[in-house]
């Protein structure tokens, strides 16, 4: 640290060493000022231990008449002592600064301290120029002490001469230049602090305005997403119950869609990531709603049961997508996950994923909802002949069973079977179905006999079982029995 700054720091430390701090105010009382004059200024003040000297100094320094001396008032004393030492050193470099200064202070203490008080106050108001004056006083004080002491006389004179030469050569220009930048800096600091406080106040005032805007924007985005979701949700009346069940299995539903078709899931993932799991749950809800729009109450039960069989559904979707999803892919790309989930709903029933549910509930709700859904969807690929072949077994055994009822209800136009009395209507459907088959396959009496003989011999049972499996084979055996009855009836009616 330079010598000048060290002197300034010494002045500050001397004031703090004797001053008393009360709250935010640090000041010198009369007793503390007396101790400071006795210990620090005893070499330059006449009768420093005299109470009258202390009272006179306190009266001259105390501007606000508080009975204490603050730091800026203490700088007046420092400035006056420095000014007296500087005058003495300027007049005679060899003179004793202490003796001359003592005489001057003793003879006209009031006048000089008054002038020093005014000038020091001006310097104190100007800014940090006080420190420079105080440093010169400190240096002059050291010089005076060096002159009073024999061992340090040369050094003190050298120091004093250095100060004299510096002040004589540079005059007041450098001191003013040094003072003015610091004054400007202090003013800028105060302005900066004030501006900073103003900015903080403005910032604190502006933040509540920005936060609502941000929250409103966030709410707007969230509202847009929610509106999109709610727009999809309001397509059916029985949506709420179905969506509650499907929302618990959102993760499984997303896995099904990803395993079903990779090409369609690209658009679905881009659309679904913005809406997170909620949109997937809503989409799953749509799939279930669209699958069961014609039968509202039975569809809810079917969807609740099918949600427990999500694992098997994902596997079946891969198998059945190649066959029937081609037409649905072209139509369902605009609908993203909705059309896929609808197709997935149909495929689950076709592949027999509801077999366990059918065994538990029999023909209560699954046969109703499943039959009507399949009937309306499965006739599009044009596989009605296949369902006609499986249509003879009883209602309790066929959903691989529901498929048989679907074929019958689709071709004969009896959609009321699956919603009223499935067992009895299937029995009636067998009576209605056989003339339809006979009308398609029998051409004349000779062909009738041939077909009947083949049914008796079991050849048709063998060909059908190779295509349809064990369930279809059993149904063809029952058809053969029915054909014998028809044959006996026709033989009895021949002329």
From Swiss-Prot:
InterPro entries: EF-hand-dom_pair, EF_Hand_1_Ca_BS, EF_hand_dom, S-100_dom, S100_Ca-bd_sub. The gene is CRNN. Residues 196-222 have a biased composition (Basic and acidic residues). Residues 96-439, 460-481 are annotated as: Disordered. GO terms for biological process: cell-cell adhesion; cellular response to cytokine stimulus; positive regulation of cell cycle G1/S phase transition; positive regulation of keratinocyte proliferation; positive regulation of NF-kappaB transcription factor activity; regulation of gene expression; regulation of phosphatidylinositol 3-kinase/protein kinase B signal transduction; response to heat. It is found in: Cytoplasm. It is linked to Esophageal cancer: A malignancy of the esophagus. The most common types are esophageal squamous cell carcinoma and adenocarcinoma. Cancer of the esophagus remains a devastating disease because it is usually not detected until it has progressed to an advanced incurable stage. Expressed in the basal skin layer (at protein level). Squamous epithelia cell-specific. Expressed in the esophagus (periphery of the cells of the granular and the upper spinous layers), foreskin (granular and lower cornified cells), scalp skin (granular layer), inner root sheath of the hair follicle and in primary keratinocytes (at protein level). Expressed in the squamous epithelium of the cervix, esophagus, foreskin and larynx. Expressed in the fetal bladder and scalp skin. Expressed at very low levels in the lung, kidney, uterus, skeletal muscle, heart and fetal brain. Residues 99-110, 152-194, 243-282, 290-303, 334-355, 403-420, 460-473 have a biased composition (Polar residues). Pfam families: S_100. This is Cornulin.
């Amino acid at each position: 640290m330079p010598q000048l700054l060290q002197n300034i720091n010494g002045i500050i430390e001397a004031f703090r060493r004797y001053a008393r701090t009360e709250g935010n105010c640090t000041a010198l009382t009369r007793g503390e000022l007396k101790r400071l004059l006795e210990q620090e200024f005893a070499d330059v003040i006449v009768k420093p231990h005299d109470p009258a000297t202390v009272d006179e100094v306190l009266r001259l320094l105390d501007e606000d008449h508080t009975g204490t001396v603050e730091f800026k008032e203490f700088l007046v004393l420092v400035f006056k002592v420095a000014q007296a030492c500087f005058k003495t050193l300027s007049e005679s470099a060899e003179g004793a600064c202490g003796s001359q200064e003592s005489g001057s202070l003793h003879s006209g203490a009031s006048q000089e301290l008054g002038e020093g008080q005014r000038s020091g106050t001006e310097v104190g108001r100007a800014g940090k120029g006080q420190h420079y004056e105080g440093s010169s006083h400190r240096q002059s004080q050291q010089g005076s002490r060096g002159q009073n002491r024999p061992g340090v006389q040369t050094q003190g004179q050298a120091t004093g001469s250095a100060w004299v030469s510096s002040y004589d050569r540079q005059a007041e220009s450098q001191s003013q230049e040094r003072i003015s930048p610091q004054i400007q800096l202090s003013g800028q600091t105060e302005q900066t602090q004030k501006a900073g406080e103003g900015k903080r106040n403005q910032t604190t005032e502006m933040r509540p305005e920005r936060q609502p805007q941000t929250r409103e924007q966030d709410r707007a985005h969230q509202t847009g997403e929610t509106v999109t979701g709610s727009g999809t949700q309001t397509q059916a009346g029985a949506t709420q119950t179905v969506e509650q069940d499907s929302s618990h299995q959102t993760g499984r539903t997303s896995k099904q869609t990803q395993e079903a078709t990779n090409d369609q899931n690209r658009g679905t993932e881009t659309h679904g990531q913005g809406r997170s799991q909620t949109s997937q749950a809503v989409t799953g809800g749509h799939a279930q709603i669209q699958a069961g729009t014609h039968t509202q109450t039975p569809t809810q039960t079917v969807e609740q049961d099918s949600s427990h069989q999500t694992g098997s559904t994902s596997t079946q979707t891969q198998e059945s997508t190649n066959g029937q999803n081609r037409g649905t892919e072209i139509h369902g790309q605009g609908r993203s996950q909705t059309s896929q989930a609808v197709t997935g709903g149909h495929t689950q029933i076709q592949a027999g994923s509801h077999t366990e549910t059918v065994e538990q509930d029999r023909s209560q709700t699954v046969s109703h909802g499943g039959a009507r859904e399949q009937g309306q969807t499965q006739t599009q690929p044009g596989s009605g002949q296949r369902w006609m072949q499986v249509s003879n077994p009883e209602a309790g055994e066929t959903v691989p069973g529901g498929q048989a009822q679907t074929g019958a209800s689709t071709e004969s136009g009896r959609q009321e079977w699956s919603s009223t009395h499935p067992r009895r209507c299937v029995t009636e459907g067998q009576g209605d179905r056989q003339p339809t088959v006979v009308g398609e396959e029998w051409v004349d009496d000779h062909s009738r006999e041939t077909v009947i003989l083949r049914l008796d011999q079991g050849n048709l049972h063998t060909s059908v079982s190779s295509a349809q499996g064990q369930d279809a084979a059993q149904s063809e055996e029952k058809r053969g029995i029915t054909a014998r009855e028809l044959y006996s009836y026709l033989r009895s009616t021949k002329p």
